[in-house]
């Protein structure tokens, strides 16, 4: 579903974690990182156990140069993934955190 269609649903009063995740993912894919981060932040406010949303939130923040905020999102996402047994998200988030720790070349 397009971000336009999802935005229309939001404007009609639908607002939930899945809708916000869809918007965040759509905007992230479109390189609209600030909008992506806004929707993904709302997503994790709806559902703090949504490890995939924490992962994407970290990406959106990192793409804006907000590495400290990205690290915080990924660390929270890693905690959630480990608590839920979400091994795939945990592995992906661990890779992002390691990349963040590497010095820039």
Label for each model-derived stretch:
Residues 12, 46, 63, 80-84:
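Structural marker of alpha-solenoid helical repeat scaffolds
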């Amino acid at each position: 579903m397009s971000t336009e269609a999802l935005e229309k649903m939001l404007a009609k009063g639908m607002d939930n974690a899945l809708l916000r995740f869809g918007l965040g993912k759509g905007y992230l894919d479109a390189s609209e990182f600030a909008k992506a981060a806004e929707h993904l932040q709302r997503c994790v406010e709806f559902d703090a156990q949504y490890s995939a949303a924490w992962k994407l939130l970290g990406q959106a923040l990192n793409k804006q140069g907000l590495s400290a905020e990205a690290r915080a999102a990924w660390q929270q996402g890693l905690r959630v993934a480990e608590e839920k047994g979400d091994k795939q998200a945990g592995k992906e988030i661990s890779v992002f955190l390691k990349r963040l720790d590497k010095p820039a070349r």
